[in-house]
Amino acid sequence: MPIPMVIESTGRAERAYDIYSRLLKDRIILLGTPVDDNVASLICAQLLFLESENPEKEIYLYINSPGGVVTAGLAIYDTMQYISAPVATLCMGQAASMGAFLLAAGQPGMRFALPNSRIMIHQPMGGAQGQATDIDIQAREILRLKDRLNEILSRHTGQPLEKIVEHTDRDYFMGPENAKNFGIIDRILTSRKDVEKDGK
């Protein structure tokens, strides 16, 4: 599917933007795909660029993602925490797996979901092949990442670590209300006016 273009007129000049670049002008980043290394590089670059433009102004990360590669997601997560600009997160459609992790990692008080979105958390998945010693090494690394993700999710949601471990043992689906009660989001939005009341 071709990327839509937007034409803007300023005085006598016209300028064409692809839709994602136009959204970036409004400090909006869209994560609408599975998370892999290429996507993570693009998201991180946009976060760093927007921080350099204005380190105090909010950045809005819209999420509709089934999740993806854990290390790629952690690159986005670490960049969100590293930059000084606050990052608001908003789930539209679904935020599953690493998508839900990034949703929860938004600025406290600025983590949103639309009414018909869904959120899913679970433990990281991985496949290993090769010699027995290599499989053992990879299995231990997956367990290390699982523990680390659970610790981070516990911190951002305010849930006890034991509860995070229990609920991520299998796919755990939530609607917006349950996600709010769980601490993954702060508010459910029904219209843009709900955000504009807070200054955006």
Swiss-Prot record:
Enzyme class: hydrolase
InterPro entries listed in its UniProt record: ClpP (IPR001907), ClpP/crotonase-like_dom_sf (IPR029045), ClpP/TepA (IPR023562), ClpP_His_AS (IPR033135), ClpP_Ser_AS (IPR018215)
One example GO MF annotation: serine-type endopeptidase activity
Location of the protein in the cell: Cytoplasm
This enzyme's EC code(s): 3.4.21.92
Active site (catalytic residues): 97 (nucleophile), 122
Keyword line: Cytoplasm, Hydrolase, Protease, Serine protease
Superkingdom assignment: Bacteria
Biological processes annotated in GO: protein quality control for misfolded or incompletely synthesized proteins
Any single Gene Ontology cellular-component annotation: endopeptidase Clp complex
Annotated catalysed reactions: Hydrolysis of proteins to small peptides in the presence of ATP and magnesium. alpha-casein is the usual test substrate. In the absence of ATP, only oligopeptides shorter than five residues are hydrolyzed (such as succinyl-Leu-Tyr-|-NHMec, and Leu-Tyr-Leu-|-Tyr-Trp, in which cleavage of the -Tyr-|-Leu- and -Tyr-|-Trp bonds also occurs)
The keyword Cytoplasm belongs to this UniProt entry's keyword annotation: yes
Disulfide pattern: none
NCBIfam families: clpP, PRK00277.1, PRK12553.1
HAMAP family: ClpP
The protein's assembly and partners: Fourteen ClpP subunits assemble into 2 heptameric rings which stack back to back to give a disk-like structure with a central cavity, resembling the structure of eukaryotic proteasomes.
Biological role stated in the UniProt entry: Cleaves peptides in various proteins in a process that requires ATP hydrolysis. Has a chymotrypsin-like activity. Plays a major role in the degradation of misfolded proteins.
Protein family membership: Belongs to the peptidase S14 family.
Record-given protein name: ATP-dependent Clp protease proteolytic subunit
Organism of provenance: Oleidesulfovibrio alaskensis (strain ATCC BAA-1058 / DSM 17464 / G20) (Desulfovibrio alaskensis)
Gene for this chain: clpP
